[in-house]
Amino acid sequence: MNAKALYKKKALRDRRKLRIKSKLLGDALRPRVSVFRSNRYFYAQAIDDVKQSTITHIDGRKMGFKNTQEDAKKLGALFAEELKKAGIERAVYDRNGYLYHGVVAAFAESLRENGIAL
């Protein structure tokens, strides 16, 4: 990809991100689960938007997981356990401008399978 195409791709993601965030709001009972995926790793965090604080997070890089669908499912199961320890059973899923496909979708499905209502 040339520089112009990369710029357009990032600009489109930023527009999606703003559109999504304007509609989502998390609180202590139903936090916002925000995900970030790089080319190599996957990260997620549960955010209380009222207090502007992170409740819990998971770091795929520190745990040795790569940015694959299988690893996203494993991370989803581990993150669901962390959320349950924090007393959270419902959340709002913030895909952070990424398309709901592949790793982002696998992580969300894994959270649902492990008892977190999104």
From Swiss-Prot:
Protein name (database record): Large ribosomal subunit protein uL18
CDD domains hit by this protein: Ribosomal_L18_L5e (cd00432)
Quaternary structure annotation from Swiss-Prot or TrEMBL: Part of the 50S ribosomal subunit; part of the 5S rRNA/L5/L18/L25 subcomplex. Contacts the 5S and 23S rRNAs.
Record has Plastid as a keyword: no
GO molecular function: 5S rRNA binding; structural constituent of ribosome
Family: Belongs to the universal ribosomal protein uL18 family.
Superkingdom as given in the UniProt entry: Bacteria
Gene Ontology cellular-component terms listed: cytosolic large ribosomal subunit
Biological role stated in the UniProt entry: This is one of the proteins that bind and probably mediate the attachment of the 5S RNA into the large ribosomal subunit, where it forms part of the central protuberance.
Keyword terms, alphabetized: Ribonucleoprotein, Ribosomal protein, RNA-binding, rRNA-binding
Pfam families per UniProt: Ribosomal_L18p
One GO BP: translation
InterPro entries named among the record's database cross-references: Ribosomal_uL18_bac-type, Ribosomal_uL18_bac/euk
Protein's gene: rplR
